Amino acid sequence: MDERITLGVTTDGYTDRVLRHSESLARTDVIGAGSGSPDREDATFVVRRGLADSSCYSLEAANEPGSYLRHSSFRVRLDADDGSELFDRDATFCAQPGAEGGSVRLASVNELDANVRHYAEEVWAAVDGGPHAYDRPESYAADVSWRVLPALAP
């Protein structure tokens, strides 16, 4: 707990991308050690004990203390903790083994079968084969698998 990390994409052709927040939305971008400090900070999260389930995790933005990745209408975004039970559930994810060796899948605690997925540079709580474009089954397993990397920002 309380470890600073960066999450990297595992999908072939996109492994140079990492999860970050930008203008209150989660997305993926090409960010590395040589990128500007603001971008590296946006791609660094502090792993916290899950707000809704202490056996799971919440990801707090390292550069915006008190703000967490959460899903709202399935879109993953960064919002300040409002103290509500709904926020706590939206911002809690349980780590499961990912499709790639050593990767992790982040399963939503309050959206059945939904996992944090990158899709067209955006990040969603997606269900394999669900009704939305971001739920498409093609590359789903890879798209919901993330590499835990050393934090890009100290």
Regions found by a protein language model. Name each.
Residues 1-154:
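Lectin-like carbohydrate-binding module/patch detector with strong preference for beta-trefoil
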